[in-house]
């Protein structure tokens, strides 16, 4: 398994402003001798609820469930209230999805199966 963290603000060269988070964590399948490399579907996970909290209970366990089903899973650690204000929360979600679409080939993702 390939586990990485990507600072989306650094990747897009955006000023962070008051944002504290905006980190994307990957749980990707590694190419092995037993399995031929292939493009995989990807899922973007937003753990938590109502932009009020990020839930550790909905983080790795959810990512690993999708991973076991053949997905490469990505978890967004996003800013929440009161620090995270509109539009910061939506911008971080947009940055995560744009990153996955831009880097799909490099990450061996199926461009038509990113959700």
What are these regions (language model features)?
Residues 1-41, 90:
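N-terminal cap/lid segment of alpha/beta-hydrolase-fold proteins
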Residues 30, 49, 77-81:
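Short beta-to-alpha linker loops that shape the active-site pocket of alpha/beta-hydrolase fold enzymes
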Residues 37, 55-74:
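Short amphipathic alpha-helix adjacent to the substrate-entry channel of hydrolases
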Residues 39-50:
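Short beta-strand element of the alpha/beta-hydrolase
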Residues 50-54, 73, 99:
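Serine-hydrolase catalytic-loop signature spanning alpha/beta hydrolases and amidase-signature enzymes
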Residues 64, 94, 98-102:
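Core alpha-helical elements of the protein kinase catalytic domain
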Residues 71, 81, 112:
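Short phosphate-binding/catalytic loops that engage adenosine nucleotides
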Residues 99-115:
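Gly/Ser-rich "nucleophile elbow"/oxyanion-hole loop immediately N-terminal to the catalytic nucleophile
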């Amino acid at each position: 398994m390939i586990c990485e963290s990507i600072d989306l603000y650094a990747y897009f060269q955006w000023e962070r402003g008051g944002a504290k988070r905006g980190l994307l964590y990957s749980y990707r399948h590694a190419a092995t001798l037993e399995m031929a490399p292939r493009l995989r579907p990807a899922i973007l996970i937003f753990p938590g609820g109502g932009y009020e909290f990020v839930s550790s209970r909905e983080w790795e366990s959810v990512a690993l469930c999708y991973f076991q089903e053949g997905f490469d899973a990505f978890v967004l650690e996003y800013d929440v209230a009161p620090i995270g204000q509109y539009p910061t929360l939506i911008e971080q979600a947009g940055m995560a999805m744009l990153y996955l679409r831009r880097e799909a080939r490099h990450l061996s993702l199926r461009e038509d199966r990113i959700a």
